[in-house]
């Protein structure tokens, strides 16, 4: 078993408290101070500062003003200050401040400056002549540079970086050529290289060295021509230059104050120069370079050397303890070259002279001291090349204690809504005072039940009895020091805050004002979705314990204001991983889905989503919209978006520690949907369906391993949007871009590449660009050249794909590479309006027309046609290899004049032909996404600039009307075609039915000079006065009633007992029609009935009467063929008596008595008559001659009926029924015409008795 460690832990805890108490009474001092730095603009700078004791708090000053931790581009973490991206506003003097309950001290200044390299002065070519075997001198005026530039030379096309052979690069930047020969003649150019920015600038003109033969013109001091004054830093290497020609270096002497400068010193000879590796202040003086010859001539040049000294303090401050009302003197003796400035500080604040604070030389005098005068005093000496400070502590005694004094008062601060704010207050006193904070609502404590809160943003989701236990204020206090932190500041937190330090001797107060500005002035009010409300209300009504209430919040509330170790060691959450694709199929909505990153040890309270619309062309952006999402959500539905638009999204996660790094995404909405395409639109989930929850990493089917969606994330970020280029200076540009999705890991840096046109290599323009910086300046571009740029995003997984190259950008100015400008311009061959804001044009350019003069690109000019002002022309620049271009940002339904020029360094060509093209009509909501394509502008036949091609004929609003009318007519034609097809189909069905169950046809004769109708008469023995009953055939029945002509009276009455077919029942379903027949009375007393006789044609004999009356023609039949007769006029019939004859009839059939028809026989309906007739034979009953009915009913069928009974035969012959009868004319089918007849006659057949 392990021994009980309880007492040991208690002892350790007591020791820690004692050490803390002792250290809290120690004055702070610095272990390390920040150092000056020179850095390239856009690159990061890191400054370090550390102090003891451990209770000391570190803060920073910039140019004497306190730095806020929320300052843009600056990150402060403990003793480290990081400038994320250096810009001119962040350059200057930085100091760190260490403070505790004793007081505060300030460090020495660290200068942060931007590296830069100036330009050479433009000058004409200088010609220098040097003698052989003598010394040559090439002068160079090195431009200003920070840090000092390295000098290089380009000699006859080759670079010289260091002294080599007979070439010596002097510290001043000049070049000395020893032992000149003919090989040394040629061109010499001086160059300056900045080691920080890696810039190299070359002298534009340079020097030309000529070599001559030796002469006896004496000697000369080539450099320096005049005496020089030098101020150098101590312990630095120094070279005093003296370039002499005409004498050897051994005849050059160096003197200091008239004495030999080399003997007994650390100076040495270097050719004809005097050098030392480390100069001391004792080396200050006058140095002379003396040259003489054998003839006694002497020449000299003098250097006045001044060695500077760092500031120093020979007598510093001492700690003092005085009583109230006494006078205090602090002495500070400073030295240095130049003389340093002396500055006094009290608790890191400069002391301004007053009636109680007086400065007299090296003494600070404080009269009538009060408790507020206690603390730390500093004397700071600074002469520009060095810094020195001395610190002393002032303690004031009052009855073994004194009233608290606020050493560091809280500062006024202005923050944005939602930021993290910290107010600090340090006080001293005996005993150590207790610090309290007061707001406008009174005392602020860290107990959850007494914490002041802002109004809940979703107050309507909570019942009046609910409590908002999310901590808003957090107070961290130590002995004599206290900090008030507001985790997510809101507008309600704005106002005055008071820090009060209290002990038994009294209290002291200090005030600070907190100003809160809205995060964005157009921030939308937060809305609550139904799902959120339902989730908040889904609690057990019976569970009213505090634990169940706390479970509603992700932040754990502690019962006291003491910070737990978990909170102290926690970090800000990582950026969320956005899972949504960069495009959406919806025109006005977007579903943003994400997965939470690492929470840093504290739960995520909320997500803040900012989005705005971007403009693809100009890069202009819309206003930000901000939405707050609860930390438990992982999805947000963005609405009221614009179709076909690009949007940018920034998203951060916030916990109790603070906000994490933002995640960035750009997405594009789809085109607006048409009403006709509603069937293709994706269906929306029904209202009230919960959002898709986040899958727990430990509860999925992959044993706790989260599998990323490879279709959504490949790890590396998406390529940024195409960058936009704007002018920064004559030789530099600003490259601006918009990032896209980060690929699941936050973007750590960007890289910009550039390419000069007509070259194939992409070069790096800037790298390691911080993710918060979306613009960078690219310098040292060649004037007159055309460049393209692209951007690369970098995260933990690697580099993204390269973005689309920017539009070609031409740098101002020309390097005069080509002196001849092109004369003949291009020829515009084709223009077309591709949308309501874009026009595309194509052109041709023949280099031979300009003697193959190289060109750099084309200028495209365009303006509205109705404008006569040349200043209205706008210009697009296109590279020389292009042959087409799209002009954007035009007005809808507007005609434009378009012309072109080609250009190079020498100038522009003449204008091309002018084309006129009109943009399309702006598409209204609901119109087709694919309008009728307009006619393009045909090319002009002339290449003159004044000729104008014909304009296009744009589709206007009337074309839409024509389109609608055409669609309606097309639909009508389609309906008509369907109707005709149905009619044809119905006719075919009827033909099929008639094929298997054909009715009797009514034949119509041909219309000739006369008409003939066959009639049959019955003899007197045929019971003329009788009635004919059962005139009905099983194939169909027709009641034929023909009206007789005037003057003819009588009735043919016949009775067929049992019907025509006694063996048949009336099973017909076909419609039957009655026809009236005329009856005629002749002189012999016979009654004749005019019955249209039907022609049997081919049907002579019948084999099967009952098989649907299908008859077959027999060639050996004894029956004659009766010709088809035509229709007849009712008033012109010739009647003949019928003789009795014996005719075979169909087998007996049964029909209902009294010749009645079935119920479905309609009086006015006539079934179509088939073209082929059958002959059916059967026995029939006797004919009843006693019938007196006026009408005789006959069976309408395809066969002739023949009767044979008791030596009496009655014959029915099928006759032709005229299709023009009044009752049946509309529904009777016309039969094919019969054979032609020569005249109108009536054939009467008499029945013969056998």
Swiss-Prot record:
Keywords: Cell membrane, Disulfide bond, Glycoprotein, Immunoglobulin domain, Membrane, Repeat, Signal, Transmembrane, Transmembrane helix
Subcellular location field: Cell membrane
GO BP: any one term: neuron differentiation
Gene Ontology cellular component terms for the protein in this record: cell surface; plasma membrane
Residue ranges annotated as Cytoplasmic topological domain: 984-1250
Membrane topology per record: Single-pass membrane protein
CDD domains per the UniProt record, alphabetical: FN3, Ig
Transmembrane helix listed as a keyword: yes
Ranges for domain Ig-like C2-type: 28-113, 119-203, 224-302, 309-395, 404-515
Glycosylation sites: 99, 179, 286, 293, 341, 426, 569, 869
Post-translational modification remark: N-glycosylated.
Residue stretches spanning the membrane: 963-983
Coiled coil location: none
PROSITE patterns, alphabetized: FN3, IG_LIKE
Location (main, coarse): membrane
Stored InterPro entries: FN3_dom, FN3_sf, Ig-like_dom, Ig-like_dom_sf, Ig-like_fold, Ig_I-set, Ig_sub, Ig_sub2
Signals that turn on the gene: Transiently up-regulated during myoblast differentiation.
Expression sites by tissue: Highly expressed in somites and the dorsal lips of the neural tube during embryogenesis. Detected at very low levels in adult tissues.
Domain Fibronectin type-III: 572-673, 719-814, 822-922
Function (record text): Component of a cell-surface receptor complex that mediates cell-cell interactions between muscle precursor cells. Promotes differentiation of myogenic cells. Required for response to NTN3 and activation of NFATC3.
Subunit structure: Part of a complex that contains BOC, CDON, NEO1, cadherins and CTNNB1. Interacts with NTN3. Interacts with DHH, IHH and SHH.
Identification of the protein by name: Cell adhesion molecule-related/down-regulated by oncogenes
